[in-house]
């Protein structure tokens, strides 16, 4: 599933394919942008912010913006979120597209040297670049961004000491980029139960620092591994391994719902911790 490293990699794919080029055509297949034509627009750069992808463009002088706004000469951002199932793919002109149903395509961007296709994208919006904060300003420090600040991430998490550490790591307002895979793997490696209250976690700084290290290690490759192995079936310690033996102690890995997501953990290596004491 797309997590911060996947979105970072996707942004680099679009950067290589489109940055510095002028679009020769566009096709939006979502109601809010159905009438938008980006032909002649210049792609400046592709960037990621947590799980959000930002494609920044400049409209040619005299070109109307979305819904008749004044767009000419202005900088705009095409925002998309991959959530659980979205993806961008870049192809050479004439290359056969991936075998995905056509009804999943949300946008097609064409330049002289590349075709970028967005599948099952969410929160697709075209906004002035100077208004990006309206879409990503709520996010915590980006684990793969220049603003990464473990102290700030810890401060945000510690503000809700009763929240479970499993849910706190997934809350993008605390730190941006962790998804379910990294949540499960980080907590296993730290020996912390996902149900532990944030206020009872012995070393929050160590926890978020490990999360950043794991995501950073997977930048530039599509196979996500936390074990050091890229072999099929050997890339995770607990995630996706329900009922299989723990790689450390041999106990069967468990799977259970935590909040709105499932979590995987080893009941021996990640023992339950006592709840916070009352006032």
Residue spans of the language-model regions?
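Structured catalytic/nucleic-acid-binding cores of DNA maintenance enzymes
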Residues: 1-279
């Amino acid at each position: 599933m797309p997590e911060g490293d996947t979105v970072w990699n996707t942004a680099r794919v679009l950067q290589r394919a489109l940055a510095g080029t002028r679009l020769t055509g566009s096709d939006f297949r979502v109601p809010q942008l159905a009438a938008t034509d980006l032909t002649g627009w210049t792609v400046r750069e592709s960037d990621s912010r947590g799980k959000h992808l930002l494609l920044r463009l400049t409209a040619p002088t005299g070109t109307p913006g979305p819904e008749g706004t004044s767009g000419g000469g202005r900088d705009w951002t095409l925002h998309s979120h991959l959530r659980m199932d979205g993806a961008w793919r870049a192809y050479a002109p004439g290359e056969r597209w991936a075998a995905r149903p056509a009804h999943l395509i949300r946008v097609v961007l064409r330049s002289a040297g590349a075709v970028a296709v967005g599948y099952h994208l969410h929160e697709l919006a075209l906004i002035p670049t100077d208004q990006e904060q309206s879409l990503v300003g709520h996010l915590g420090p980006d684990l793969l961004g220049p603003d990464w600040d473990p102290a700030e991430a810890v401060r945000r998490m510690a503000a809700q000491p009763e929240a479970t550490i499993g849910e706190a790591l997934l809350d993008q307002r605390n730190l941006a980029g962790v998804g379910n895979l990294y949540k499960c793997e980080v907590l296993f490696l730290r020996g912390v139960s996902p149900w532990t209250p944030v206020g009872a976690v012995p070393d929050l700084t160590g926890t978020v620092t490990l999360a950043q290290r794991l995501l950073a290690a997977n930048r530039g490759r599509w196979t996500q591994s936390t074990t050091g192995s890229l072999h099929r079936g050997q890339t995770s310690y607990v995630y996706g391994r329900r009922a299989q033996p723990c790689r450390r102690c041999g106990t069967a890995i468990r799977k259970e719902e935590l909040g709105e997501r499932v979590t995987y953990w080893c009941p021996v290596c990640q023992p339950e911790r006592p709840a916070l004491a009352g006032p």
